[in-house]
Amino acid sequence: MREQLEQMRQQALSAIAAATTEEMLNEVRVRYLGRKGELTGLMKGLGSLPADERPKVGQLVNTVKDEVEALIEQTMNRAREEATAKRLATERIDISLPGRGRRQGSKHPVTLVIEEVSEIFAGLGFSVAEGPEIEHDWYNFEALNFPPEHPARDMQDTFFVENELLLRTHTSPVQIRTMLKQKPPVRIIAPGTVYRCDSDATHSPMFHQIEGLMVDSQVSFADLKGILTTFTNQLFGQKTGVRLRPSFFPFTEPSAEVDIACVICGGSGCRVCKQTGWLEILGAGMVDPEVFRHVGYDPETISGFAFGMGIERIAMLKYGISDMRLLFENDVRFLKQF
């Protein structure tokens, strides 16, 4: 058995030396040291030897097993190190190569305008107020002095949900809710989404508005003009011309449309401004006394003004966008310009 053990030892050492990968070394391990391995078989055969030879032969078998196992482990570690070194050599990072830039998103032009308008009015002492988009008829129409027969109540203009609930057609209901909760003075803007049954190059069934309200004692039309002139000059530039034209809104009296000098032609007249030199940007006026009565304010002691603008229209004028539908198409080629 001694000769057989030495022969097996030499064979195992030769097999280990010939192995170049972890897989080959594992095969050698199984062949000699596994449950059915050759060295394991010798250990099981010790029982057939005379009793006086068993300890010596058993010690020799264990010595060979330890030697083979240690050499396999040593060779395995060396094979792993060589494989790692080879992989590192082929996967080496060239730190001189330029880095890959991350794709950066940008804010939507509507969001940019809302933030800029809100910041301007914050500087004028206005705070932001919000309200529900599904609104009750009373807040959206009646409290704002819209009589039941007013055309804005027609199905072609308003999305009715059920009974007296509807999708708000403007953010004016936020003004009503604020005045019902808060006594004068009031100075708020109400940005938000509104809905109307209309869709073409300059209209959308869903769009955004910012409306404003200022209520206090002795608020005058001159205050309204001063606030809006300051706003337009900050938004479009200090040299932007501003004019107010008489108009009509059920919830304000007197009412006005606010125009700015055409941002395309500078007021000289072009296709965009229809040769007038002016572009309408918002509506405004002094709050009608009837609206104050609806919210429990005394129109004899307080006064105020309100104004409202479409954010998409402001964005189109500010960024030179010709079709409002571009703002809702989610075309990255368009949006990444902002």
From Swiss-Prot:
One Gene Ontology molecular-function label: magnesium ion binding
| Keyword entries, A-Z | Aminoacyl-tRNA synthetase, ATP-binding, Cytoplasm, Ligase, Magnesium, Metal-binding, Nucleotide-binding, Protein biosynthesis
Q: Where in the cell is it found?
A: Cytoplasm
InterPro entries xref list: aa-tRNA-synth_II, aa-tRNA-synth_II/BPL/LPL, Phe-tRNA-synth_IIc_asu, Phe-tRNA_ligase_II_N, Phe_tRNA_ligase_alpha1_bac, Phenylalanyl-tRNA_Synthase, tRNA-bd_arm
Q: What is this protein called?
A: Phenylalanine--tRNA ligase alpha subunit
| HAMAP family, per the entry | Phe_tRNA_synth_alpha1
The keyword Nucleotide-binding appears for this protein: yes
Reactions performed catalytically: tRNA(Phe) + L-phenylalanine + ATP = L-phenylalanyl-tRNA(Phe) + AMP + diphosphate + H(+)
Q: Identify the PROSITE patterns for this entry.
A: AA_TRNA_LIGASE_II
NCBIfam families membership: pheS
Q: Where does Mg(2+) bind?
A: 253
Q: Name one GO cellular component term.
A: cytoplasm
Lineage here is: Bacteria, Pseudomonadati, Thermodesulfobacteriota, Desulfuromonadia, Geobacterales
State its Enzyme Commission number(s). 6.1.1.20
Q: Assembly and partners?
A: Tetramer of two alpha and two beta subunits.
> Is Transport one of the keywords?
no
> Which coenzymes or cofactors are required?
Mg(2+)
